[in-house]
């Protein structure tokens, strides 16, 4: 794995120009802010879009990938199940999924797919008080058909699937424990 600053056009272009083509590129980096449209400052909204959408766009645009290889974007369940306090995040995720479908056409024979995770127990949530985080996970698990929140391995398996299946392109795979139907 290689870490790149997805906000740095020059670093991204320099990296891919100096690299041999990749078999697979996964773009999961982002920093977004939640909040209602009325409450989220426009500067924070623009920074979120710059990070998650335009960051993925930059990498997908510059990435050198072998024919038959893949690019996988990571969106999120809010594109399918919006929240009044996460409107922007839902819109960004929907935009990423549309970008993935369009890139599948443009970049063919490179395959492009999107994985859309639900609530996943990652370090992202470690900033919450322990009792609040555990309560949120328990409430979510109760309403999910899978009866649990996701683990990073659940998303890794989905990314591996779309990366290695030669017939998967232009698809969005939702891995949310049934959250979009619950």
Model-found features: residue ranges?
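Catalytic Tyr-x(3-8)-Lys segment
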Residues: 133-154
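Conserved NAD(P)H cofactor-binding loop of Rossmann-fold oxidoreductase domains
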Residues: 26-35, 177-178
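Short beta-loop-alpha junction of Rossmann-like oxidoreductase domains
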Residues: 35, 119-129
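Rossmann-fold cofactor-recognition segment
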Residues: 1-10
């Amino acid at each position: 794995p290689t870490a790149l600053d997805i906000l740095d056009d020059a670093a991204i272009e320099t990296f891919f120009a100096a690299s041999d083509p990749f078999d697979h590129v996964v773009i999961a980096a982002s920093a977004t802010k939640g909040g209602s449209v009325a409450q989220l400052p426009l500067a924070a909204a623009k920074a979120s879009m710059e990070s998650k959408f335009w960051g993925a766009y930059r990498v997908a645009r510059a990435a050198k990938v072998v024919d038959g290889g893949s690019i996988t974007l990571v969106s999120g369940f809010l594109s399918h199940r919006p929240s009044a306090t996460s409107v922007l995040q839902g819109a960004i995720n929907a935009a990423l999924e549309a970008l993935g479908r369009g890139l599948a056409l443009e970049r063919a024979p490179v395959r492009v797919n999107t994985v859309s995770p639900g609530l996943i127990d990652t370090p992202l949530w470690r900033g919450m008080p322990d009792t609040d985080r555990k309560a949120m996970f328990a409430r979510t698990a109760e309403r999910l058909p899978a009866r649990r929140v996701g683990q990073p391995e659940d998303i890794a398996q989905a990314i591996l699937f779309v990366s290695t299946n030669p017939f998967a392109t232009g698809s969005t795979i939702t891995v949310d424990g049934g959250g979009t139907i619950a």
